[in-house]
């Protein structure tokens, strides 16, 4: 514990959490156990009195700042003459109340720090997850086409013969138009993707709509093996 004499009526000390534990107090007990908290602060006052001859006379003003490695405490004697005339019992009671108040304030500060830490941790996790998804998306190739109507979607489902099963697909609808997005795995050959795209264009049309636009404004009708779902729910159309 480091003690600094500011003037005749004020002292400042800084004590690390390891110093607190060395004195037989745990960090949790200090902020959550009233009796242990008072015991700790009175022991500090005894040590301050021994080193700096700072005798407790009358009420004290106490200010506490919690840091990552410890706490800084500023203690000042009151200069108010009326308060200086208080009895020892009244002064002790007021000191105890101030100790409890500063403990509560410091505990609240600790809670706020923990909430801030949790918030930053969640933000970092979200950013990490977003980077992972972005990285995963870079390792895939996506094609998007549009169908004029549901009949074209059904015709494609019954006449297509997927060259590969290594893809994920989504069927969107917005403003009465159907959009079909296919995400190919990174190891699928570009030639296979080109063939699949050519097969799609026999029933659908190119589009400048992006996946971001569709996710924001369109409704997902089907996902995961869309063609199989279409064949399950809709009969083949006859020309």
UniProtKB/Swiss-Prot annotation:
The lineage's top-level taxon is Bacteria
Q: Where are the stretches annotated Disordered?
A: 118-137
InterPro entries associated with the record: MecA_C_sf, Neg-reg_MecA
Which terms does the record give in the GO molecular function aspect?
protein-macromolecule adaptor activity
Q: Where is the composition biased (Basic and acidic residues)?
A: 118-128
Q: Name one Pfam family in it.
A: MecA
Q: What domain comment accompanies this record?
A: The N-terminal domain probably binds unfolded/aggregated proteins; the C-terminal domain interacts with ClpC.
Q: Which family does it belong to?
A: Belongs to the MecA family.
What is the role of the protein in this entry?
Enables the recognition and targeting of unfolded and aggregated proteins to the ClpC protease or to other proteins involved in proteolysis.
Q: What is this protein called?
A: Adapter protein MecA
